[in-house]
Amino acid sequence: MNKHYQIVIIGGGTAGVTVASRLLRKNQNLKEKIAIIDPADHHYYQPLWTLVGAGVSSLKSSRKDMESVIPEGANWIKQAVSSFQPENNSVILGDNTVVYYDFLVVAPGLQINWSSIKGLKENIGKNGVCSNYSPDYVNETWNQISNFKQGNAIFTHPNTPIKCGGAPMKIMYLAEDYFRKHKIRSNANVIYATPKDALFDVGKYNKELERIVEERNITVNYN
C-alpha cells in the first residue's frame, strides 16, 4: 500500500531523529505527517565510540532500540529505500512500496566498504587492525590499546569522506595518554597518517595541534 507524508526523512541516525524532533517541537500540526525510513533495529550514538575505543565507555551505552528514539508524532518505516523518484516526489522501498512526500530529508549516513582496501576486510578486528567507525569492531580498539606493549601504534585518517574527521586524532591522543599513564610510552612509536596537508583545516587550531603532537613526540605523516 502506497503512502504519503508531508515530510519524509531517510535515516534514523542522530541527524534524522533530531530533524524530526525539532520539526515536531516547532509545529505540532506535523504530528503523524512525518515518516522516518530506516531498516535498522538499533540506533547508535556514534560520537561515543571514541570513548568506547578508549575504554572509557561501553558500546551498550551508545545503543538504543530504534523504536525508543523515534519522536512521538513521527512514523517509523522499518524498510530500506531502494530508489529515489524526485520527479514524482517519491521513494521506493525494498518491498516496492511507494512513499510520496512534499519535502524530503536525506540523512542515511555512510556505508563503510572495508573491501575497497585490499586486505582490510580479512583483517579488520584482528591482527592488530581495528576501527572506531563500526559497532562490530570498536571494542577491538580498546583491546588493542590495553594490550599494547611495544611497537608502532599507527592511527590513520581516511582519504574519503568519513563520519567524523576528528575521530582518528581523538583516539590517538587518548591512546597516547594511556601509554604514558601505564609507563609504556617509551616503547611506542605513535604515528598519525593523514592524506591532508594539515592536522586541522582552521589555522589557529592547526597551529595548536602541531604544538601538541610535537610536545608528545607523535610522528605525523602528511599527504
Which positions does each model-derived feature cover?
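Beta1-alpha1 glycine-rich phosphate/pyrophosphate-binding loop at the start
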Residues: 2-75, 159-203
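Amphipathic coiled-coil/heptad-repeat helices and related helical stalk/stem segments
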Residues: 62, 137-141, 205
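Short, conserved catalytic or adaptor-binding loops enriched in Gly and charged residues
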Residues: 66-71, 120-124, 211-214
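A conserved beta-strand/loop element that lines the FAD pocket in flavoprotein oxidoreductases
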Residues: 71-85, 214-223
